[in-house]
């Protein structure tokens, strides 16, 4: 699909979504406040609608005038606080509300034969319920956005391993991903996150890439902040998507500058490579594969890198997971598979029995732990944001993986 068609499709979707929501909210207001002036209500809603749509109109106008597919936003606080944030907050409120309202409408259609004699009463009740739901989400969505901006969850995962080497018993691996230093994830937010990482007292720290979002501006900040992490056996990272995008037209330079900045703080960013070391008498191998939109290792080079024998514990660190890579790691007897990229479903909507996120269209491995026989795969929720400048129902995460011998753990 061409860029122009994507723009037109996005505009059409926004129009239809807002049209449905506006119709619902006008009916709901009249149900709750029957004496409300209809013209004033509609006028206020039109003004609010026009205001929140300044952002997409700006993007369309900027694209039309520049003919570029990538539009750089003004780097001013007021533009983000008064234009960008209101648009995305309102869009999330609208979509979250519509998901529930569509379900209610569907139930009304299905149950219509049973209540058609009381149609007017049911319709009035439905409109009042609509008002209550929208009012709730107007409060909940911004509140949750604020919470997910400031909060960091520490998740501890006990990994019970068959025949674990005694010297690896209790090894604490702190795993993070998608830090994405930028104008939104600034020094203060990074400080809070690194403080949480250090509070886990890690033996080993592994990162699934994406230390910045874009532009070289934040390379040194990202390296400096990660350099504050205390780790007994060091800090290691694979290459992520955004690590390629400091210079959009020169991805190799982007990765090189990020790698060099990290090296100043004794942090290794490994691009399709491996690192071996001993913990006591235990031999540990870590393999780092660049599995991103820009670069994917496949075929014989991938097999050569993954193939290894004679190690007591093997870890694979990648940015993006994927079924073929998972099966490869499993076939080469890796114990632990670590990935990020998804932000845990950065925007996740509330819905009965399931969580709905756009990330579901890309991968089934959105967050949490997955077992493939004896291999454990962990998908970390990360810290940063992409496209939408905040998180919704996806609290940033530091994952702590503690190794235990399965027999000893079972005996307890």
Predicted regions and their residues:
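Hydrophobic alpha-helical transmembrane segments in integral membrane proteins
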Residues: 137-163, 183-188
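Soluble catalytic domains of enzymes that build or remodel membrane lipids, polysaccharides, and related
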Residues: 164-412
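Short extracytoplasmic/periplasmic juxtamembrane "stem" segments immediately C-terminal to an N-terminal membrane anchor
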Residues: 81, 85, 156-170
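Non-catalytic terminal accessory segments
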Residues: 1-150, 410
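Short, functionally important structural connectors and interaction interfaces within domains
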Residues: 75-78, 144-146, 151, 160, ...
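Short amphipathic alpha-helical coupling elements at transmembrane boundaries
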Residues: 112, 159, 192-195
